[in-house]
Amino acid sequence: MRWLLTTLSIQWVITGEKLNPKGTYLVLANHQSWIDIMMVMVVLGKGTTLPRFFMKWELVYMPVINICAWALDFPIMRRYTQEDIKGRPELKNRDFDYAHDVLSRNPDQACVVVNYAEGTRFTPEKHRKNRSPYQHLLKPKVGGPQLALDCLRNRLDGIVDITLAYPGATLSVWHLLSGQVPKVMIHVETIDLPEGLEKTPETLAELKAFRGWMNSIWAQKDARLERMLNGTPEDDHRSP
């Protein structure tokens, strides 16, 4: 993956921190295209264990993707609706139990879990329907990050915010491989989990506090994306 992408005619601008290759991390990233997965693997794959992505159940029907997901032991989420759970209450915690089982395997090994908190890829139409207060992002959902934190809490070394930007590019795997993504900007930054948010929210006030923390991260990410899309890197950059 790294060899393929680093041989393409792309101007790479990667800024921010390098992670401990033996660390266990929860990664929060914005999501615009399928190529985001490749980019996260490029920026993390050299120094850390191979990232694992929370994946929607619908994607298991897609060739290649399903094989990779099973082989790499991705946590695959069905995301049951309230109607589903009403008819079958036992489904309420099934995603959590499954993810916890997957991410609890080999607890002595480093683990990097990537969650796209927006829950779907950004498009102008989704942005309009989402009524997002952000210019370049959809509103973050808290369920995925909470689930990942619950699964990794006892061995988590840090939370990582990754911001992906593709100035002036049309985003698809074909555009990437045909040389039509001229520039990729990636910023990596570790963030702290505020005191009081270490445990799973159990009350409305705790849920509100967790949501407020996620919204503050997204506000900073949105401002960073604006700078990156205007061609301004966050600091001194490095090669992939």
Residue ranges of each PLM-predicted region?
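A cross-family acyltransferase "interaction/gating" segment
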Residues: 60-75, 80, 107-201
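Accessory terminal regions of nucleic-acid processing enzymes
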Residues: 198-240
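Short His-Asn-centered micro-motif
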Residues: 15-16, 28-31, 54-58, 116-118, ...
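Short, glycine/acidic-rich beta->alpha junctions
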Residues: 32-36, 94-95, 139-143
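A general structural motif
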Residues: 22-24, 48-50, 108-110, 156
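A Trp-anchored, charged/polar loop motif used as the substrate-binding/catalytic surface
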Residues: 91-105
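Membrane-anchoring hydrophobic helices of lipid-metabolizing enzymes
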Residues: 1-25, 39
